[in-house]
C-alpha cells in the first residue's frame, strides 16, 4: 500500500513543481473554502476522536491538542489563506553571476519533492503541512496519530476534493489512515519516494526516526524551554513574561517548563512569583531551598530530578535557584532541548553572554518563549520547529521546504 502511495506522490510532485504561484494560490483558496463549507463533517469526525481519547484516558493537555472547535477550524482556514499572501520562494535566484569562462550561473530555489510527516494528536498539522507543501510545489504523505485518525481522514478528503476541483492529482496530499504502527517503520524506509521526513511528536518518535529512517530527518518540536531571571531583572515585567510563557497555551512546545532564578533576587522574587502563579493555577516544583523561600498561595510540590528533563505541556513549572549566569547556562546545556530559552535582565553584558552561549534555535532577551512560531516570526504557518542545525533551524516556513539547483547558461561554452 505504502509503495503505491509513494509512486503516486512522486508523480504528483513533478506536476506540482511546474505550477505558477498564481495556480498554487488558487488551490489554497479552494482548500480554505472547502474547510469552511465542510466544517460540520470535520467537527463530527473530531468529536468522535475526542470522545475516544477521553475514554482512553488521555491527559487534558493531549485532549486540548486534539480538539477542534468552529473557531479553531475557522482559524485554520484563515491560516491557509494567509499562506497565499506569502512570497513563493520557488524559482527565486539565490545567487549567481557570469563566470570567467563565459558561463552564466544561477543557484535557484526548487521544491524538495515529496515530504513525509509523522505527527501525533494535532489535527491542525494536517492542514498546516499540506498548505505549506503545496505552496512550495511539494507533495506530502501524512501519518497522523491514531488519536486523530478520523479527523485527519475527513480533512484530507476535503483537501483532495479541492485538488481535484483545480485539476491536480489527489495524490499530492495523502494520509496513511491505517493506525497500524508497523506502517511507520515501513514509511521510514521509503527513501526511494520521500525526500525529507519530519517527525512531530515525543522523544520516542524522534529516537525511532533518527535510528531507523533511511530518509533525511528533521527533528524538533520537543521544548524543555527555560527562562533565566537574572539578579538585575525588573520584577513586574518578569512576572508578566513568565505568566505569558507558561499559561497562554501550556500544551505548546514553546511554553516555558523551567524557571532559573538567580540567588541574589530569589528572596524578593519567589514570594511574588508564588502569588502570581496561584492566580494562574500553576503548580510549582521546587527543591527544599526553593520551597523555604517560595512562601505564598501557589501549590508547591517537591522537585524530582528527572522532572528537569520533562516537557510538562501542562500548568506545571520547575523552579531552580542558580548561583550566577554560568550556572544558568550550564543548566540549560544539560537539560534543554535547544528549542527556545530566554533571559530576563537589565544587564546587557549578561544578555549578550546568554545570546552567544545558549545554543538554542531561538534565544530571547526580556521576551516570552511563546514567540517561537512561524506566524509570529512572519513566516506564515509552520511545518515544524527544528531543533537541529541541518537543513533548517527554528520555525520551518516555506524556504525550509525547498532546496536549490545550479543552472548554467552557455553559448557553446566548454571548459578549458
Curated annotation (Swiss-Prot):
Catalytic activity from the UniProt record: L-glutamate 5-semialdehyde + phosphate + NADP(+) = L-glutamyl 5-phosphate + NADPH + H(+)
GO CC terms in record? cytoplasm
Q: Does the keyword NAD apply?
A: no
Q: Which GO terms describe its molecular function?
A: glutamate-5-semialdehyde dehydrogenase activity; NADP binding
E.C. code: 1.2.1.41
Instruction: Report the locations given in the UniProt record.
Output: Cytoplasm
Q: Which Pfam families match?
A: Aldedh
Q: Which GO terms describe its biological process?
A: L-proline biosynthetic process
Q: Which UniProt keywords apply?
A: Amino-acid biosynthesis, Cytoplasm, NADP, Oxidoreductase, Proline biosynthesis
The biological pathway it contributes to is:
Amino-acid biosynthesis; L-proline biosynthesis; L-glutamate 5-semialdehyde from L-glutamate: step 2/2
- Identify the InterPro entries for this entry: Ald_DH/histidinol_DH, Ald_DH_C, Ald_DH_N, Aldehyde_DH_dom, G-glutamylP_reductase_CS, Glu-5-SA_DH, GPR_dom
Please describe what this protein does: Catalyzes the NADPH-dependent reduction of L-glutamate 5-phosphate into L-glutamate 5-semialdehyde and phosphate. The product spontaneously undergoes cyclization to form 1-pyrroline-5-carboxylate.
PANTHER family given for it? DELTA-1-PYRROLINE-5-CARBOXYLATE SYNTHASE (PTHR11063:SF8), GLUTAMATE SEMIALDEHYDE DEHYDROGENASE (PTHR11063)
Q: Which HAMAP family match?
A: ProA
- Family from the record: Belongs to the gamma-glutamyl phosphate reductase family.
Name it: Gamma-glutamyl phosphate reductase
Please name the source species: Salmonella arizonae (strain ATCC BAA-731 / CDC346-86 / RSK2980)
Amino acid at each position: 500500500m505504502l509503495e503505491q502511495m509513494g509512486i503516486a506522490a512522486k508523480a504528483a510532485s513533478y506536476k506540482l513543481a511546474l505550477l505558477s504561484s498564481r495556480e498554487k494560490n488558487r488551490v489554497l483558496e479552494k482548500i480554505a473554502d472547502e474547510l469552511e463549507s465542510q466544517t460540520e463533517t470535520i467537527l463530527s469526525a473530531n468529536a468522535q476522536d475526542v470522545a475516544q481519547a477521553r475514554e482512553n484516558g488521555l491527559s487534558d493537555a493531549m485532549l486540548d491538542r486534539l480538539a477542534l472547535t468552529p473557531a479553531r477550524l475557522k482559524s485554520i482556514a484563515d491560516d491557509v489563506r494567509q499562506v497565499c499572501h506569502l512570497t513563493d520562494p520557488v524559482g527565486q535566484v539565490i545567487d549567481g553571476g557570469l563566470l570567467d569562462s563565459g558561463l552564466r550561473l544561477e543557484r535557484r530555489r526548487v521544491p524538495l519533492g515529496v515530504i513525509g510527516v509523522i505527527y501525533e494528536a494535532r489535527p491542525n498539522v494536517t492542514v498546516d503541512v499540506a498548505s505549506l507543501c503545496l505552496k512550495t510545489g511539494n507533495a506530502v504523505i501524512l501519518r497522523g496519530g491514531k488519536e486523530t485518525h478520523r479527523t485527519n481522514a475527513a480533512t484530507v478528503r476535503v483537501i483532495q476534493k479541492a485538488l481535484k476541483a483545480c485539476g491536480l492529482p489527489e495524490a499530492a496530499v495523502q494520509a496513511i489512515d491505517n493506525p497500524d504502527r508497523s506502517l511507520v517503520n515501513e514509511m521510514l524506509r521509503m527513501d526511494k519516494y520521500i525526500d525529507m521526513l519530519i517527525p512531530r511528536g515525543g522523544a520516542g518518535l524522534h529516537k525511532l526516526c533518527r535510528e531507523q529512517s533511511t530518509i533525511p530527518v528533521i527533528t524538533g518540536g520537543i521544548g524543555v524551554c527555560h527562562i533565566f531571571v537574572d539578579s538585575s531583572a525588573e520584577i513586574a515585567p518578569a512576572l508578566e513574561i513568565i505568566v505569558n510563557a507558561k499559561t497562554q497555551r501550556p500544551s505548546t512546545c514553546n511554553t516555558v517548563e523551567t524557571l532559573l532564578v538567580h540567588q541574589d533576587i530569589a528572596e524578593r522574587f519567589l514570594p511574588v512569583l508564588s502569588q502570581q502563579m496561584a492566580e494562574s493555577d500553576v503548580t510549582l516544583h521546587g527543591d527544599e531551598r526553593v520551597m523555604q523561600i517560595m512562601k505564598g498561595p501557589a501549590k508547591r510540590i517537591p522537585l524530582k530530578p528527572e522532572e528537569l528533563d520533562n516537557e510538562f505541556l501542562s500548568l506545571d513549572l520547575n523552579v531552580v535557584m542558580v548561583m550566577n549566569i554560568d550556572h544558568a547556562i550550564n543548566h540549560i546545556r544539560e537539560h534543554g532541548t535547544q528549542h527556545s530559552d530566554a533571559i530576563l535582565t537589565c544587564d546587557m553584558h549578561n544578555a549578550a553572554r546568554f545570546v552567544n552561549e545558549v545554543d538554542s534555535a531561538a534565544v530571547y532577551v526580556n521576551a516570552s518563549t511563546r514567540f517561537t512560531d512561524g506566524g509570529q516570526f512572519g513566516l506564515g504557518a509552520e511545518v515544524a520547529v527544528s531543533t537541529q542545525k541541518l537543513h533548517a533551524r527554528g520555525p520551518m516556513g516555506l524556504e525550509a521546504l525547498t532546496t536549490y539547483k545550479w543552472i548554467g547558461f552557455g553559448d557553446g561554452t566548454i571548459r578549458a
